């Protein structure tokens, strides 16, 4: 059934652009690396994850290090396990003062049908982090609700949005239905977050981007 958008992402899209990322379907950590460090994955080996190679032992120039020199406190937040992509150790080498993962969030009981912690929990964590310091903050937040895999069987009891007509492939209909319902809930989260930040008693700049397209059997022509 049709469902109006919450206008959460619509508000953000008033100032939008295009971002070329180095991965499709997976590889969030490599998009993270490029956006945090400013370095292209073209300088690394084919299929390499800097989080698992050079950053397993070395530090790296990054936005957090630059901002720390300007008096900022630097934080990373992620509603997933800290060891995923070795973030537990990598983020300190990228210059983050703190890293809050799901292990340190008070209530992670609200999860998707496939077990990912829903993104609305991030609003409180972001505000809590802003409140915890006197200096300006740089907060890099990674959401996980829309993560795959995407079920090929119906897993939502009463979906807000239903999907049909995916090239006569019923299983793909269920995958897209699951995905778009997660995006719908994430849109509501964005609206809640932007509302909270609009009322925050400090100047705030919010930048959002997508790390990669979903794993939906997309072909090259679908990416053009």
Where are these regions (language model features)?
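Solvent-exposed soluble domains appended to multi-pass membrane proteins
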Residues: 1, 6-224
């Amino acid at each position: 059934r049709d469902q109006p958008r919450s206008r959460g992402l619509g508000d953000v899209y008033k100032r939008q652009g295009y971002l070329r990322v180095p991965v499709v379907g997976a590889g969030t950590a490599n998009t993270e690396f490029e956006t945090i460090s400013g370095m292209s994955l073209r300088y690394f080996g084919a299929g390499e994850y800097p989080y698992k190679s050079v950053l397993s032992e070395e530090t790296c120039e990054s936005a957090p290090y630059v901002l720390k020199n300007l008096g900022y406190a630097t934080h990373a937040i992620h509603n997933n396990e800290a060891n995923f992509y070795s973030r537990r150790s990598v983020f300190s080498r990228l210059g983050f003062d703190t890293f809050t993962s799901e292990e340190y969030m008070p209530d992670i009981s609200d999860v998707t049908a496939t077990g990912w912690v829903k993104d609305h929990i991030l609003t409180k964590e972001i505000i809590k982090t802003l409140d915890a310091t006197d200096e300006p903050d740089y907060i890099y937040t990674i959401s996980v609700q829309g993560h795959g895999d995407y079920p090929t069987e119906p897993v939502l009891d009463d979906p807000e949005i239903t999907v049909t007509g995916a090239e006569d492939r019923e299983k793909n209909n269920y995958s897209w239905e699951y995905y778009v319902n997660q995006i719908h809930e994430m849109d509501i989260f964005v609206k809640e977050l932007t509302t909270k930040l609009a009322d925050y008693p400090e100047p705030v700049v919010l930048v959002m981007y997508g790390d990669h397209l979903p794993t939906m059997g997309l072909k090259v022509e679908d990416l053009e």
